[in-house]
């Protein structure tokens, strides 16, 4: 095989290994085998809440305040339609900013943390010790973390959306004051509906699931000592950032590409 095909071949091989690992992990959750370690899943869920919630909420508050609040208010003022600042809050926060911010922080905080923890266990032979003791490591280490993510992330995502909405309202109504609270919410709810919230939640859960699975894969398969764990952490971060953009783009195209669900036109 020509040398220039070596890199694409290695990439495809790695993607195949990741896909197989993800399929096995999800199968362990769907089959119910992970329930034998439900206590560990609850422990991981608690770690996710206490270690990530405030960081994610803080990020979406800042983005909702600035990107979807202040900028939207001044843009609408320049267009002569300050009363329509709620449009940007309804669309910007829910459809794009919160899913992207959620994915970025999950990649940087949760994904890399999983790689570092599992990688340290791998190079110190703790995973091999689990096998010797008769504990299935894939179930105990990977499937429990995925189940914990599915228990926690819907709450984290929906609460993040609410915080972003509050931040945008705070910027538009209280800080800039171009529109009253009643006028703001009139337009805000005209451009938003329950299916949009469901679609955004699906995007967020797809992104979160991919991040956790990638983190588990790179941590579980780490090798080469501390340097290898660092390399695996960097690889997981790069892949997760790519997946955040790809999944969010595909979600936007599927859910709103053909029908933006906007009360405009005839």
For every predicted segment, state its role.
Residues 53-65, 69, 150, 154, ...:
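Hydrophobic alpha-helical segments of membrane proteins
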Residues 118-143, 226-229:
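Short cytoplasmic-facing helical segments at TM-TM junctions of multi-pass membrane proteins
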Residues 49, 53, 57, 97, ...:
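Selective transmembrane-helix segments that form parts of the transport pathway or gating/packing helices
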Residues 70-94, 163-205, 214-235, 258-266:
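Membrane-interfacial helix-loop-helix connectors in multipass membrane proteins
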Residues 85-128, 214:
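Hydrophobic alpha-helical transmembrane segments of multi-pass membrane transport proteins
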Residues 1-40, 218-223:
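Short, membrane-interfacial amphipathic segments enriched in basic
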Residues 227, 231-249:
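C-terminal transmembrane helix-loop-helix hairpin of multi-pass membrane proteins
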Residues 48-101, 105:
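Active-site cofactor/substrate anionic-group-binding motifs, chiefly glycine-
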């Amino acid at each position: 095989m020509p040398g220039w095909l070596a890199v694409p071949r290695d990439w495809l091989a790695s993607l195949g290994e990741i896909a197989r690992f993800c399929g096995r992990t999800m199968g362990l959750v769907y089959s119910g085998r992970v329930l034998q370690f439900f206590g560990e899943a609850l422990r991981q869920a608690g770690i996710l809440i206490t270690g990530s919630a405030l960081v994610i909420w803080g990020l979406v508050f800042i983005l909702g305040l600035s990107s979807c609040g202040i900028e939207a208010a001044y843009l609408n003022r320049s267009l002569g339609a300050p009363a329509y600042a709620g449009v940007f809050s309804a669309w910007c926060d829910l459809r794009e900013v919160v899913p992207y911010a959620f994915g970025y922080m999950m990649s940087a905080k949760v994904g890399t943390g999983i790689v570092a923890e599992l990688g340290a266990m791998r190079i110190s032979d703790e995973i091999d010790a689990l096998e010797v003791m008769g504990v299935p490591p894939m179930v105990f280490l990977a499937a429990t973390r995925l189940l914990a993510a599915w228990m926690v992330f819907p709450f984290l995502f929906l609460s993040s959306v609410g915080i972003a909405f509050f931040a945008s309202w705070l910027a538009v109504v209280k800080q800039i004051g171009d529109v009253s609270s009643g006028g703001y919410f009139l337009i805000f709810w005209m451009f938003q509906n329950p299916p949009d919230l469901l679609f955004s939640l699906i995007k967020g859960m797809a992104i979160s699931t991919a991040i956790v699975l990638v983190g588990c894969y790179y941590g579980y398969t780490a090798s080469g000592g501390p340097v290898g764990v660092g390399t695996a952490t960097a690889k997981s971060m790069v892949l997760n950032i790519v997946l955040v953009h790809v999944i969010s783009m595909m979600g936007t195209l599927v859910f709103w590409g053909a029908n933006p669900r906007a009360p405009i036109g005839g």
